Amino acid sequence: MELPFPTIAVSEGAANLLVPDVPRRKGPGTAGPWPFYNPTMAVNRDLSAIALANWPHPLGSLLDGLAATGAWGIRMALEVGAKHVAFNDRSRDATRLIRENLRRNRLAADVHTGELSSYLVERRHDFVDVDPFGPPTPFLRAAFRAAKERSGIGITATDTAVLCGTYPKACEKRYGARPLRSAQGAEIGLRILLGYCHGLAAARGRQIRPILSFSAEHFLRVHVLVESGSASDSIDHVVRVDAGRFIDASGADRGAIGPLWLGPLGDPAVVRHLQPSAWSSVASARLLSLLKSECEMPPFFATTDELAAAERHSPPRLDRFIEGLREIGYRATRTHFHPRGVKTDAPSQDIARVFRELSPTGSTGDSRPAS
């Protein structure tokens, strides 16, 4: 097949794909006049396949809404076994490449050339994937407007500098929320994205239930179920008061963050049963293990860096610190959001006490919970 750009054959998951053979760099990638493909996003597609294979109810039809090479939809067809997968992209070169990739994987599917918002006016699917180059916001209103009862939406956001606090004014303009550049920036950004999704669903008299949400590399990813229901009490503002501790706040409060989603980032009934597939990478399996360990933990976390600065003690080994919190009856685990972060339900005074006791530079006495 003749295409106006060079191509190369690659394998990803269960799929064999023809993709543009163009220079690549780390991070979100570089757009060009060719269908976009970023191999580092394989982790995204690995976790999508695992989530959709364990979705709370059967999914009859899936839409790869901004399909590019068709990698997401083809992998879902092969790995999830969806009965019907459709593809949409506004580029004719992209839809030609998608058809070739379908042929290579011995699949048949509907392939449409056009704008996603127009496509969604005419067609409905059980799950719509929105994975753009750039922010997802231009496509989300149409996606939520078209969402059927108990349908799902998967959203990838690569505008992490905006959501995670580097450009707070851009975040307020784009998502209607104030972020915070901090160790917790990725979790805050993910919760802002979910809060934005909640607002779009609420405008249609519906609510969202996050099934699986995470941060990885240079992107944020959410999978949500859209259900009927009244406004959620999971939306609020918070303010940071000390290392890893945030409390509810009014949107008018100085330093207030949000509005953002404060409910679970995933459905524990689903997440705790997820297992890597035969096609999952080592990186995906490692990420999934962390997501399972923290899926029932409260929002936000502290890092040993923050605690070391606050307590003026050298940090203990992370695993020993977690063990110390567990020994006095609290839940504690690593978090995928930060390599030195700890999620726990311990109050701040006990977090600090255990940290000081286990610090290699000194001890402050016993570590019984504070009364």
Report each predicted region and the residues it spans.
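SAM-dependent transferase fold signal centered on methyltransferase-like domains
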Residues: 1-371
